[in-house]
């Protein structure tokens, strides 16, 4: 009986660790060893590569932004240029149309001026002609047409037409002494040159 009891008694089982299992956190035989320094360096290198990729992409985006900004500026500049050209064409057309009409009025201005010189000041007719003359000049000025009366100025062939010369030792050469016929400009364009007599020092 005792033998059976002995036979039925089981010897204690021990859970021995397998060759590749960790029992105390240490690397067991047969498991590849990892170098912590190498692992850290690899991680840093990987982050550097990712950073370089991000910087490269950022640089591309920056270049694209500069390109689009330049394109936008060119588009705005082109638009402004077209606008200026169109406005200039409108102004030139307007000036051309007014110029033809204004030239017809200049002869009326000249006739009124001549009449004023020949009429006695204070006469009722003189007053009426003077009022008409002033109204005509005001009408011209409202359309940016200005009278040129350059006595004492230096002769400028762009706006003046010399019809004669007079000796005047006290004046510099080409000083305007008399205005035979006044000129007119419309904005910055010549409508009619002023006919003038200019000075010279001697014959």
Swiss-Prot record:
It is found in: Cytoplasm. It holds the Pfam family GrpE. Coiled coil: none annotated. One of its GO terms (molecular function) is protein homodimerization activity. InterPro entries: GrpE, GrpE_coiled_coil, GrpE_head. One of its GO terms (biological process) is protein folding. Residues 1-20 have a biased composition (Polar residues). The keyword Cytoplasm applies. Keywords: Chaperone, Cytoplasm, Stress response. GO terms for cellular component: cytoplasm. Residues 1-46 are annotated as: Disordered. Participates actively in the response to hyperosmotic and heat shock by preventing the aggregation of stress-denatured proteins, in association with DnaK and GrpE. It is the nucleotide exchange factor for DnaK and may function as a thermosensor. Unfolded proteins bind initially to DnaJ; upon interaction with the DnaJ-bound protein, DnaK hydrolyzes its bound ATP, resulting in the formation of a stable complex. GrpE releases ADP from DnaK; ATP binding to DnaK triggers the release of the substrate protein, thus completing the reaction cycle. Belongs to the GrpE family. Homodimer. This is Protein GrpE. It comes from Ehrlichia chaffeensis (strain ATCC CRL-10679 / Arkansas).
């Amino acid at each position: 009986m005792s033998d059976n009891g002995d036979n039925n008694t089981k010897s204690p089982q021990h859970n021995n660790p397998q060759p590749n299992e960790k029992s105390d956190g240490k690397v067991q035989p047969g498991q590849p060893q990892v170098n912590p320094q190498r692992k850290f360096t690899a991680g840093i290198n990987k982050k550097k590569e990712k950073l370089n990729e991000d910087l490269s992409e950022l640089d591309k985006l920056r270049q694209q932004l500069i390109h689009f900004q330049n394109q936008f500026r060119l588009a705005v500049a082109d638009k402004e240029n077209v606008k200026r050209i169109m406005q200039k064409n409108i102004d030139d057309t307007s000036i051309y149309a007014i110029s033809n009409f204004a030239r017809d009025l200049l002869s009326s201005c000249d006739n009124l001026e001549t009449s004023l010189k020949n009429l006695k000041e204070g006469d009722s007719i003189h007053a009426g002609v003077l009022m008409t003359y002033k109204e005509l000049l005001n009408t011209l000025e409202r359309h940016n047409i200005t009278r040129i009366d350059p006595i004492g100025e230096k002769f400028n062939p762009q706006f003046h037409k010399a019809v004669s010369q007079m000796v005047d030792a006290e004046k510099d050469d080409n000083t305007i002494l008399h205005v035979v016929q006044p000129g007119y400009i419309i904005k910055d364009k010549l409508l009619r040159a002023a006919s003038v007599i200019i000075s010279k020092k001697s014959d």
